[in-house]
Amino acid sequence: MPRRRRSSRPPVRRRRRPRVSRRRRRRGGRRRR
């Protein structure tokens, strides 16, 4: 029974993160506490 070729590391669930501009977020977050 041939073994299936798979990556050694287990499957990892990727978190979906909305695209946010770091510059804008930092400025807004700092100003609006």
From Swiss-Prot:
Protein localization: Nucleus; Chromosome
Stretch list, region Disordered: 1-33
Protein keywords: Chromosome, Developmental protein, Differentiation, DNA condensation, DNA-binding, Nucleosome core, Nucleus, Spermatogenesis
Highest taxon listed in the record's lineage: Eukaryota
Listed GO biological process terms: cell differentiation; chromosome condensation; spermatogenesis
Region forming the signal peptide: none
GO CC annotations on file: nucleosome; nucleus
Tissue spec: Testis.
The keyword Nucleus is assigned to this record: yes
GO molecular-function term, one example from the UniProt record: DNA binding
Function: Protamines substitute for histones in the chromatin of sperm during the haploid phase of spermatogenesis. They compact sperm DNA into a highly condensed, stable and inactive complex.
Protein name per Swiss-Prot or TrEMBL: Protamine TP14
Organism: Oncorhynchus mykiss (Rainbow trout)
